[in-house]
Amino acid sequence: GDNSLYTQDNVTVPDRSWRLTATGRKQADCIGRWLVAQQQLFDRYLVSPYVRTRETAATMALPKAKWEETRVLRERSWGEINTITQDDFRTNYARNWMFKRTDPLYWRPPAGESIADVSENRVHNLLTSLNRRAEAESVVAVTHGDFMLALMLTLEDLSDEEFMRRADDPAWAITNCTCLHYSRRDPATGRTSSRVRWEQTARPVFDESTGRWEVRVDPWREFQRPLLSNGDLVDVVHSVDPHL
C-alpha cells in the first residue's frame, strides 16, 4: 500500500481528531439525502464524539436533529498499531499479525480491542440504555465500521462461524457511510415483533456513468436467534478438524 501519508506529523494526530476526506463528505451527503427521503425525523440522534463522525452527522443534514454525543459509539481501539504501517505491524508484532489473519473476531491489537470486546462491552451498554430509555422510539446513530460489525454480531446473535463467514465475504463489508437499518416492524405486513428481527443495508456507491454518488439498497432480510440442539452442536464440532 501507499505509506506516504505516514509522516511524523500525521502519525501523532489522535485517531479521534481525523476529519473526513472530500470523498467522505460526498458519501455522507449522499446517505443523508437518502435517509431524509426515507424518514424525515427521528426520536433520538446519537453520534460518536470523534471529529469524523461529528462531521458525517453534520453533513448528513437531517432536519431538526439534536445530536447526543456518546463515547460508547467511539471507534474500536487499535492500540499500539493505530498509526503504523502494515509492514511495521508485520515486522514488530509478528505473532499478533498471525492471529489477525486467522481469528478476526477474537483477535485483539496490542493494547487494543477485539470485535468481541466491543460487542460484549460497549454494544451491550448501548442496547441496554436504549431498551430502558428509547424502547419504542426511532434512533439514528452515527458511528464507525467495526462498531457496526459488533452491533450486527450482537443484535443478530451470530455464531462465531457465521461471523467468520461474513468477514471473508466482500458482500458483507461495511464500506464508508454504510447504513444498517434494524427494525422490529415486519416490512411486508407492518406488524411489530417483540424484538428486532429485520435488517436492510444501504450504502453509497459511485456511478461511473453519471459521475455521481448514489445509494444502493439491499432487500430487507429477516433473522432469528439461533437455537441449537445437541445434534447441531455435534455437527459444528465435527466440522472442525482435531488438532491433537
Q: Where on the chain are the PLM-derived regions?
A:
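An N-terminal RHG(E/S)-centered segment typical of histidine phosphatases
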Residues: G1-D43, E55-A58, R185-L244
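Short glycine/proline- and acidic residue-enriched helix-loop micro-motifs
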Residues: R16, N96-D117, E222-R225, H238
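Phosphate-coordination/substrate-recognition cap region in phosphate-metabolizing enzymes
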Residues: D29-M98, D168-T178
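Generic structural signal for well-ordered alpha-helical scaffold segments
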Residues: D29-V36, S119, V123-N131
